[in-house]
Design a protein with these regions (language model features):
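Metal-dependent nucleotidyl/phosphoryl-transfer cores and adjacent nucleic-acid-binding surfaces
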Residues: 212, 229-248, 254, 263, ...
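Basic/charged alpha-beta structural segments of nucleotide/phosphate-handling enzymes
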Residues: 33-38, 43-185, 201, 227, ...
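ASCE RecA-like P-loop NTPase motor cores
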Residues: 1-26, 35, 39, 159-219, ...
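Generic beta-sheet signal
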Residues: 31, 55, 219-221
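Helicase P-loop NTPase motor core
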Residues: 1-27, 32, 179-181, 246-295
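A short alpha-helix capping/helix-coil boundary motif
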Residues: 218-224, 246-249
Length: 295
């Protein structure tokens, strides 16, 4: 259906945002369990375990086989066997042998690279081979070997999801977080993805699939007073080619109303000011000293 991008300024006042009614009733997937716990603590009954959980649970439910131990072990074995058996001589014999030996030793990096290529659905014919480093050329040859053999079945990544498939995956993710949740009571016309600032290929793929049948809300914290820090987030979310709806709530400031997090909030506020070059605005406690390093 669509992707909407919303920001918020004060994590303690999400319930004051214009979109509050929209996000408090639908499946809500956070970048981390820490964020889940924080939302549950602040908003209590409106953010109960189950409806609110981690995006990793959603990924593991949507791409169940791809994320399974059985799949990972099989793919590791396939890649090791391909490298050990030898590849077409695309490099000098000594260099190719050295790279093969190094990749068998650093097998996890090779495994992750090949997985990402499948997650991105890379067209092998669109790779400009002459622009690659020797190591990259070797990886591409492993990728080619997989694609041209029966081993490609071990790297199958489901892509054809029906609306019912998506709903079932969402239900599984929520039930994994809380076994007694009533999935039917959750509005699944909309899905929230909160706090992601490094979009891995598999997360991007999941968002695209969700957006085919649902409204996907991408939600992130934006503090305009710390533009040097938060500009990266604006740049990342702008890549979705959807307008970013900025918050209309006042910017967050450390408050003694939240004593547990107050000192941490003051520290974060000071770091933000330092990053913006606002040295004179930093509030100093008696045991804090600022040192300026000149290189």
């Amino acid at each position: 259906m669509s992707i909407a991008i919303y920001t918020y300024r004060d994590p303690y006042k999400l319930n004051k945002e214009a979109y509050w009614d929209e996000i408090k009733e639908c499946p809500y997937f956070c970048v981390s369990q820490t964020l889940v716990n924080g939302l549950k603590t602040i908003y209590k009954k409106d953010f109960q375990q189950g409806r609110v959980t981690t995006i990793q649970y959603l990924i593991e439910s949507l791409y169940e086989y791809w994320e399974s131990t059985a799949c990972i072990v099989k793919q590791h074995t396939d890649i090791d066997n391909i490298i050990s058996a030898g590849l077409p001589p695309v490099l000098g014999s000594d260099m190719q042998e050295n790279i093969a030996r190094a990749f068998l030793y650093n097998r996890e990096e090779v495994f992750e690279s090949i997985r990402v290529m499948f997650e991105l659905n890379i067209n092998i014919n669109e790779i400009i081979f002459d622009k690659l480093t020797p190591e990259q050329k070797f990886i591409v040859e492993v990728f080619k070997k997989i694609l041209s053999s029966e081993k490609k079945n071990d790297f199958f990544l489901k892509d054809d999801f029906s609306g019912d498939d998506i709903d079932t995956a969402i239900d599984r993710a929520m039930l994994r977080a809380r076994k007694d949740i009533e999935c039917a009571s959750v509005n699944k016309d909309c899905v929230v993805i909160h706090g992601v600032h490094q979009f891995s290929p598999i997360v991007l793929r999941a968002i695209e699939k969700l957006a085919e049948s649902k409204k996907v809300i991408l939600l992130f914290n934006y503090q305009p007073q710390y533009k040097n820090i938060y500009q990266t987030w604006i740049d990342i979310y702008s890549a979705f080619d959807s307008p970013i709806s900025d918050s209309n709530v006042a910017e967050f400031r450390p408050s003694l109303s939240f004593p547990i997090s107050y000192e941490g909030n003051v520290l974060a506020d000071n770091i933000g000011k330092l990053t913006n070059g606002q040295m004179t605005d930093v509030s100093l406690a008696s045991d804090i000293e600022i040192l300026e390093l000149i290189i």
